[in-house]
Amino acid sequence: MESRNEAYEGAYNATFWGDFSYHGYGFSEDGSKFCEQIPILVNSFGVWEKLDLPIRGMKIWDYSLPHLESVIVLVLCLWQFFYLSLKKIGLPVPKITSMMIAGAALSQTNLLPNDWTIQHILFPDDTRPKVPETLGGFAFVFYWFIEGVKMDVGMVRKTGTKVIVTGIATVILPIIAANMVFGKLRETGGKYLTGMEYRTILFMQSISAFTGISRLLRDLRINHSEFGRIVISTAMVADGTGFGVNLFALVAWMDWRVSALQGVGIIGYVIFMVWVVRPAMFWVIKRTPQERPVKECFIYIILILAFGGYYFLKEIHMFPAVGPFLLGLCVPHGPPLGSQLVEKFESFNTGILLPLFLFFSMLQIDGPWLANQIGQLRHFDGQLYEALTIIIVVFVAKIIFSMIPALLAKMPLTDSFVMALILSNKGIVELCYFLYGVESNVLHVKSFTIMATMILVSSTISPVLIHYLYDSSKRFISFQKRNLMSLKLGSELKFLVCIHKADHISGMINLLAQSFPLHESTISCYVIHLVELVGLDNPVFISHQMQKAEPGNRSYSNNVLIAFDNFKHYWKSISLELFTCISNPRYMHQEIYSLALDKQASFLMLPFHIIWSLDQTTVVSDDVMRRNANLNVLRQAPCSVGIFVHRQKLLSAQKSSPSFEVCAIFVGGKDDREALALGRQMMRNPNVNLTVLKLIPAKMDGMTTGWDQMLDSAEVKEVLRNNNNTVGQHSFVEYVEETVNDGSDTSTLLLSIANSFDLFVVGRSAGVGTDVVSALSEWTEFDELGVIGDLLVSQDFPRRGSVLVVQQQQNVACR
């Protein structure tokens, strides 16, 4: 017994016990034995550890949790530094590219001396658990699952023939061209790339990964344009074509037993997803009460299935990310399930965990070897030369064969080239595949160094080129005057009405019914229901037939459909069309621009972002995102815009009040003239009594002069001249002039008449720069309403009358 104890203590001496106590592991004196504490030490013993044992005590990042936190902070700060720096100098490099740059920047730190702190943090010894790398792998699986959830497979059914031809050509034809070149390269002595490496590089350069392209379009903010929709549809077709080519290659090049196993495995997995998992998800949605979240247990089951799919495809030797991606495709998009998954996990995964994966992936780049290969390029020799030959051939072929179908479809040359650039861009999808190739021993680390560098170059340069070649804002510039002033009397009046929430429906219907001559057949009304995009990757635009919606049907626009269907049923003479747009609030203005241009609308009505209770004393909803959407519309709308603030108890649209009192406040300027032009249109409704209140400052400083003053006078005279509709001795227009000294007088005057009118119409820029609003502008809370409009909706103002703030069309381009 004593001899055994002596042997034990001889093998494990005092040094070992010091290591074991603090490190959680230790080596015997001769280095032949290793002992580890289970479970491992996660946290340190505190700040006194190094003072207690200065030799044996660990550094704080030697423990798992502090080490993980150190790496997360380092990676976060580094990629944010690159992202913000590049953005500051005008280079719109995507966030994912910045994460890759951060990893590439520190990839050579493994060449530093071992006693450097950065070495201990980024390249720990093999005895320590790789917690950051493990979480990065977790993010890798999660990324593919979330991308599948956000993808709308239904878009494939809506693609046209030209899009399908472009998507197939941009994958198949570059592969054919590259095979021809590679054959010639082999004949002239190419010897560095193996056949499997060549096929892997060729395939990944030829495909157009939908998930990567969709993220690029989001980063460049062009996924909401018509051009963006075409590119997304083309990428979906190209991605499907690439998947088919991959399956064909597996059957042709691999052992038939392996191919059979993979074929049976993937078919069985798809059948299980479509016929078992997806119906189960619909069963979960059916059991979930409307407007309520899905139970957490179902969310966890789906996550387990995602990781199970990953490991299943890994076992049958297929790209494992396809497993969680296919599961994501099976998740019904939108609320409650799809949107809840995206809201719950995407931000954390993309912002915290995914940078770890990209960072550690790029750490594998061998910089010195790559520099040596670059030097060999002048001799037209080396592995880099062979790989670059394939990359350039496929890239050029992909650009050409992507542009030709687009040009034949009469797409502008610049747009065709930009689309080809987008389809040729490489990013996280390709990086994931090459990394999987290294882990599967299909690619050597040297080949991964080349391809990771090429992906980094592509994902850095392509977005910058696309940003400067394609200006999406130009797509929304009108070449004609689309405002009410330029509209001839008797011409068709085209409204575009925006609805954000169900609370806006009755207010907009009441405004239309009470204010405008709906009995005439010269009014067209286009209604767009704007729904926040959650749980989807790309916007959805739906054109509805005006048919009666079925109550109880769970639809995005069910309430809107029912309400406006009844509205059209009563006002049969009006032309009415309804649309639903599911979009990111930051880009909703682009959807509104597109529809306004397409329908040649003259006036666009937006609901105010604040909703009050019925007694007008409490704010029920204050949606900042909707406010930002309104502000974006005002900046570049292709027609005149009105922001409607509903502040009164609603009247029935079918039983109009005998008279509807409207006050048009006029100071001067183009917005006020547009407000008067709107008043002229309202005069065609026999139930409208219009009062034009002209505010004249005691001092004329800042007032319009010259041509603007003539236009102001002409518009007032036009309103009075058209006052020909009378019933007996009743006049429909009353013209009142009031002189005010300052903003205080204006406020007092408007307070005195607040309860006399049902609707106030005012220009957004009314009184700006004059004594009419002096001192009031300092208290303006909502810039989109202007100074007087903001006063009319303030807390101190009586809340009987609604307010319509008008802005005339801002931008008219010259051909």
From Swiss-Prot:
Its main location: membrane. Keywords: Antiport, Ion transport, Membrane, Potassium, Potassium transport, Transmembrane, Transmembrane helix, Transport. InterPro entries: Cation/H_exchanger_TM (IPR006153), CPA2_transporter (IPR050794), Na+/solute_symporter_sf (IPR038770). One of its GO terms (biological process) is proton transmembrane transport. Preferentially expressed in pollen. GO terms for molecular function: antiporter activity. Pfam families: CHX17_2nd, CHX17_C, Na_H_Exchanger. The chain crosses the membrane at residues 71-91, 136-156, 163-183, 198-217, 230-250, 265-285, 298-318, 351-371, 388-408, 417-437, 450-470. It is a multi-pass membrane protein. GO terms for cellular component: membrane. It is found in: Membrane. PANTHER family: CATION/H + ANTIPORTER, CATION_H(+) ANTIPORTER 5-RELATED. May operate as a cation/H(+) antiporter. Belongs to the monovalent cation:proton antiporter 2 (CPA2) transporter (TC 2.A.37) family. CHX (TC 2.A.37.4) subfamily. This is Cation/H(+) antiporter 5.
